[in-house]
Regions:
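Catalytic-site signature segments of enzymes, centered on catalytic residues
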Residues: 53, 110-151
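Alpha-helical scaffold elements that line and support the substrate/ligand-binding pocket
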Residues: 30-31, 56-78, 101, 143-151
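Active-site helix/loop module of the DD-peptidase/beta-lactamase fold
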Residues: 56-60, 72-113, 129
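Short, conserved catalytic-motif segment at the N-terminal edge
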Residues: 1-57, 77-82, 125, 129-130
């Protein structure tokens, strides 16, 4: 593992791309082998960024959720080209594939009903009760609040 290249890329992100604040931690076989933190928590440069700075994770979980879904599909003899409704019978878009779901094309980017994101069953019920916001093939829309529930 070339940790010097990681350090260089980290510094370059600040010097050449205007990074405000960032940190990275790399672990190998249960041992932290790199811990970098630099920058500021806000543009006013009041609080320095450190390795304990708490930040929203947002879309970083999408890759992990997608990888998990793809592994589950493979383990169960399914393909990304299979229909979501094969495993989620109440899925509101009966012609959507897992590939379309994972690439934000299934038209369920927002919830029609007001639902608490802390109530999983309520959100799933809201998703199942709504119609797609567009026809498959006609659009694409980032699914920031529904993606995790869809997966």
């Amino acid at each position: 593992m070339d940790l010097e290249a990681v350090k260089l890329a980290f510094r370059k992100n600040f010097a050449e791309h205007g990074e405000l604040g960032a940190s990275v931690s790399i672990w190998k076989e249960g041992v932290e082998v790199l811990n970098l933190a630099d920058g500021w928590c806000e543009r006013d440069e009041v609080r320095p960024w450190n390795s304990a700075t708490i930040v929203p994770f947002y879309s970083a979980t999408k890759a992990l959720a997608s990888a998990t879904l793809l592994m589950l599909l493979e383990e169960n003899g399914l393909s990304p080209d299979d229909l979501v409704c094969r495993v989620w019978t109440n899925f509101p878009n009966s012609s959507a594939t897992f590939s379309e779901l994972l690439s934000h094309q299934c038209g369920l980017a927002a919830l029609d009903q007001k639902s608490s994101v802390f109530d999983h069953e309520e959100v799933i019920s809201a998703i199942e009760a709504q119609e797609s916001n567009w026809e498959l093939g006609d659009g694409h829309g980032y699914h920031p609040r529904t993606f995790g529930f869809l997966v």
